[in-house]
A protein has these predicted regions:
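N-terminal Rossmann-like or analogous alpha/beta NTP/dinucleotide-binding catalytic cores
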Residues: 2-136, 161
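Active-site cores that bind ATP or allylic diphosphates and position pyrophosphate for catalysis
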Residues: 113-175
């Protein structure tokens, strides 16, 4: 009997061109993981709308991100490599999770405070609820491993909190 692979989930915001930091910080590791884990790698188009609202540019960026990542060695035959927005279950789960995410939790997020300080003209609900959407992305796949940058570690802690609150209210649904 074959052992079931553990699940990895991570997302990439399509906001610019792939650069060496992306490659050495994430892509190289994604390529290594694809043989050992069941991988879900997402182009996070909804997340990018929080800071890059031009939808024409977004569509072009999404296509380019797919091409760049495949060129770096990500194999669509080995991983689920998909765009976030067509997965409607994400939006539904995001709605439920927002009921578990209190205003105080979200306002103390370091990334939110940084964005408010850097761009006070663009303080939108998407920025405030970014960790909630990220939680939906993660727990939808029941991911055990979620490789993220240092700036996203607080979001992972919040994801655990939101998932635990969801389980407490609705029963043990998510690991």
């Amino acid at each position: 009997m074959s052992k079931q692979k553990e699940i990895v989930m991570s997302g990439l915001r399509p906001t610019g061109y792939l650069h060496l930091g992306n490659y050495f910080g994430a892509m190289r590791n994604y390529v290594k993981m694809q043989d050992e884990y069941e991988c879900f790698f997402m182009v996070a188009d909804w997340h990018s709308l929080t800071t890059h609202p031009d939808t024409k540019e977004l569509k072009e960026n999404v296509r380019r991100v797919f091409a760049e990542n495949i060129a770096c060695g990500l194999d669509p035959e080995k991983v689920a490599f998909y765009c976030q927005s067509p997965v409607y279950e994400t939006a539904e789960l995001y709605l439920y999770l927002n009921m578990m995410a209190y205003k105080g939790d979200r306002e103390k997020t370091t990334t939110f405070k940084d964005k408010v300080r850097q761009h006070p003209e663009n303080v939108n609900a998407g920025l405030l609820t970014y960790p909630v959407l990220q939680t939906a992305d993660i727990i939808l796949h029941r991911a055990k491993y979620v490789p993220v940058g240092k700036d996203q570690e607080q979001h992972l802690e919040m994801a655990r909190t939101f998932a635990n609150r969801f389980n407490h209210r609705y029963g043990d649904v998510f690991p």
